[in-house]
């Protein structure tokens, strides 16, 4: 409960929990301007797939326009000093979330990409400035992003999302 309640109060990366009050109060935000700058660094084919499926950046999913009409992507997370804790963003929504979770052709949403880019980007560039990501639990869903499953290239989803950020997963 010590972690579930505060994460839920911040929206828990779930539209059902991200009430207008939670969205407006959330301090962790990625401006549309910063997100577009990050998005512009993606491999062209990967970026085009995201736009085709989710629309132009910053999208509408988890976007708050109460402070900035251009939009800010809200990241439901808890930050304490040099540690940040968040629920992994969803890959998508629909009637069959398990199929969406494991869909190797579904590109990540703008919100999904923004969360990882915020984690990895330097603080002076609007990010958290992490040195690594640690996934806890059964497994994450990065490995299900479009692209190869071994010998990843910059055009593969997991590499495009994480960039140079090391990922420590459950062994």
Where in this protein do the model-derived segments appear?
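Catalytic or ion-translocation cores adjacent to nucleophile or general acid/base/metal-coordination motifs
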Residues: 1-21, 84-88, 95-123, 127-133, ...
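Extended, H/D-rich, highly charged conserved domains that either
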Residues: 1-85
């Amino acid at each position: 409960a010590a972690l579930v309640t505060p994460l839920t109060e911040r929206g828990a990366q779930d539209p059902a929990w991200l009430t207008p009050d939670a969205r407006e109060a959330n301090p962790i935000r990625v401006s549309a301007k910063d997100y577009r700058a990050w998005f512009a660094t993606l491999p062209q084919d990967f970026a085009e797939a995201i736009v085709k499926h989710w629309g132009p950046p910053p999208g509408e999913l988890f976007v708050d326009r109460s402070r900035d009409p251009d939009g800010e992507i809200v990241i439901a997370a808890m930050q304490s000093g040099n540690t940040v804790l968040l629920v992994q963003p969803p890959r998508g929504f629909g009637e069959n979330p398990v199929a969406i979770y494991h869909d190797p052709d579904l590109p990540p949403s703008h919100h999904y990409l923004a969360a990882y880019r915020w984690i990895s980007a330097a603080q002076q560039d609007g990010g958290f400035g992490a040195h690594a990501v640690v996934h806890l639990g059964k497994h994450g869903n990065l490995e299900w992003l479009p692209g190869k499953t071994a010998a990843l290239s910059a055009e593969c989803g997991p590499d495009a999302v994480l960039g140079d950020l090391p990922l420590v997963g459950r062994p």
